[in-house]
Amino acid sequence: MEPLARFEEIKIPLIEPVHGLEAVSGVLGVPEWWPTGARVSVVLAHGASGSKDDPLLVALQQALTERKVLTLRFNFPFAEAEKSKPDPMPVLERTLRHAIATLGRDPTAAPAHLFIGGRGLGGRVAANLATSQVRSDGLFFLGFPLHPPGRPAELRVDRLFRIVSPMLFVQGTRDRSCEIPVLRKTLVRVGAPTTLHVIDEADQSFRVPRKTGRSAADVHREILTVLDAWIERVLGG
């Protein structure tokens, strides 16, 4: 049986070297028969303590690519250089912009639709970029860092009010960086269409207690189902 997708290790050039690096690593997921069909693409950015090999991002890429979506997950420079401290926001934004640009290198195979987002910090970088430099069909946040851990009064929401694309928030009830009641109040004030999906008992990394009887794979499947259905709705499917 022929595979439904292929996955290619790629290098994403950086205009300016960071940590002595001239490029960062990425994995491009190419669906069977691409670029036929709706030509939808999804770019997945990792969080502050992760990398492109975050198990959730790997699982999402595998499943979405098999569902005929062009996908890309990649390293920010600090992860590529195995540094623990994230790069300054301008560096992160440039890297995400370069990653997105790789999808359109071949105009004959460029996607017609773009969705960007990711885990924690990666989602925040996507939000920053979407307000000024990149046009996307939608943004998704897998654990949005709404405020510093345990300090809900110190909100980081200015960028959300400038976004016009639809947004999906997937949040765990035990995420100390995003209290659900505070997020709900914030989203009421956001002008763009928003969708919130809450995962009971999940923390910022979407881990759930053993008592729930749910495995990491169960949670990953739930997130995939929500993300896939949301993309379909945004595209009018």
Question: Where are the regions that the model predicts?
Answer:
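Serine-hydrolase catalytic machinery in alpha/beta-hydrolase-like enzymes
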Residues: 10-113, 206-216
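Short beta-strand immediately N-terminal to the catalytic nucleophile in serine-hydrolase-like folds
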Residues: 113-118, 142
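Gly/Ala-rich beta-loop-alpha elbow adjacent to hydrolase catalytic centers
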Residues: 118-122, 126
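A conserved short beta-strand
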Residues: 135-147
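Short beta-strand/loop motif that positions the catalytic acidic residue
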Residues: 162-164, 169-171, 175
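Acidic catalytic loop of the alpha/beta-hydrolase fold
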Residues: 173-178, 204-205
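Catalytic histidine neighborhood in serine/cysteine hydrolases
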Residues: 190-208
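Catalytic active-site module of serine/aspartate enzymes centered on a nucleophile-bearing elbow/loop
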Residues: 210-237
